[in-house]
Structures are given as C-alpha cells and as structure tokens.
Amino acid sequence: MKLLIVDDEELTRTGVISSIDWKALGIEEVLQADDGINGLEIARKYRPEIILCDVRMPRMTGIAMLEKLENILPDSIPIF
C-alpha cells in the first residue's frame, strides 16, 4: 500500500513520516508533496491508496486537489 502526505510545511511532513512505523501498518511506500499541484502530479503517477493532506496550502488547497483526484482515484482514502 502507498501513502501520499501533502503539506506545505516540510517539518510537518518529515515529522509524520519519522514518527510512525508505516511498514507495521502495511504501508510499503510513503510519498510526499509540498502543495496541491505537486500532490496531484504525484498521486496521478503513483496512485496511492491513502492521501494524508493539509487543507490550506499555497497554489492549490487540499480540498481542490482531492476534488480533482476524485474521478481519477475513486478508491483512495483522503484524510485531512
């Protein structure tokens, strides 16, 4: 399973990644993006099953990104 973490704060992304044993939860790959536009590109390319996303980010909000992904990745689980 793949997880995508989308947040404009690098410290938040690295903190979430390093503080949880993702492999123990069945997450084999943790991807990250710094805003909604990059998150959209990475999600289209890698097709993560879970997307952990900040709501307020520059360039594209998390909500706008997930609205665009709704038809592309209908089975992905978004978490805000």
Per-region residue spans from a language model:
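Acidic catalytic/metal-coordinating carboxylates
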Residues: 35-38, 61-64
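Conserved catalytic motifs of ABC-family nucleotide-binding domains
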Residues: 47
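Receiver (REC) domain active-site loop signature in two-component systems and cognate sites
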Residues: 57
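Active-site residues of response regulator receiver
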Residues: 7, 54
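Non-catalytic signal-transmission and effector/linker regions of two-component phosphorelay proteins
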Residues: 1-2
